[in-house]
Regions:
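Fe-S-dependent hydro-lyases/dehydratases of central metabolism
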Residues: 1-235
Length: 235
């Protein structure tokens, strides 16, 4: 069991994905084989449940057996909002817990990052690739389709329009999330910006539609960017 101690707080412009990309940068896609990663520390308390789900989901990229977060006040708040408060049981690490290894991550030091072809651990800062032209953008998937994720994207799009040479699609996590985003006007902002909304289901991340063009460049918020997973090994 490996302790991942999170301290500090994410800067504006950084998202939860930065945390797991930093893990991939350090550990690599095979470095986590046989390991269980337990995320603890003051930085964890600031991460809401969907954010923790993103990190846990992408523990698979590390080769991890599983990833664990505490069932703390954030989980309590989430279950209460879902009308399931009675299901909450606090589950925290023992104060004297012993670990096989420890990884320290100061969230305040993280920069916006991106995983480049063709392995999830080929991590670079956004500054390294920001001038590259792209043909396709996909927003959503299991790892970035929560209310907060899509609302942030809509905020960026507000008052702008997708470039005529770019195909941009978005898939929301669930019907509940979709209705909340519609209620608050975020879906309308995306539609006005020229973003095409996809059905709530598996899709572009596992090559069910939206396959990139030959030798094309796609930017996706989805996980598992292994070669060919999007449907075209040349992209």
């Amino acid at each position: 069991v490996v302790k991942v101690n999170l301290t500090g707080e994410l800067k504006p412009g950084c998202n939860t994905k930065e945390i797991i990309l930093e893990m991939l940068r350090r550990v690599t896609i095979k470095g986590g084989l046989g390991n269980v990663y337990e995320y603890v520390g003051p930085g964890v308390a600031k991460l809401e449940v969907p954010a923790r789900a993103t990190i846990s989901n992408m523990g698979a990229e590390l080769g991890a057996t599983t990833s664990i977060f505490p069932a703390d006040e954030q989980v309590h708040k989430f279950l209460k909002a879902q009308g399931r408060e009675e299901a909450y049981v606090e589950l925290l690490p023992d104060e004297d817990a012993q670990y096989d290894d420890c990884i320290e991550i100061n969230l305040s030091e993280l920069e916006p990052m991106i995983s480049c072809p063709h392995q999830p651990d080929n991590v670079m800062t956004l500054k390294d690739v920001e001038k590259r032209k792209v043909q396709q953008v996909f927003i959503g998937s299991c790892t970035n389709a929560s209310y907060a994720d899509i609302a942030k994207a809509a905020t960026v799009f507000k008052g702008h329009h997708v470039n005529e040479n770019v195909s941009c699609t978005c898939a929301v996590a669930s019907k509940q999330t979709y209705r909340e985003l519609m209620r608050d006007g975020y879906v309308d902002i995306l539609l006005q910006a020229g973003v095409r909304m996809l059905e709530i289901a598996c899709g572009p991340c596992c090559a069910i539609g939206q396959t990139p063009a030959t030798n094309g460049v796609a930017v996706r918020t989805s996980n598992r960017n292994f070669k060919g997973r999007a449907g075209n090994p040349t992209a």
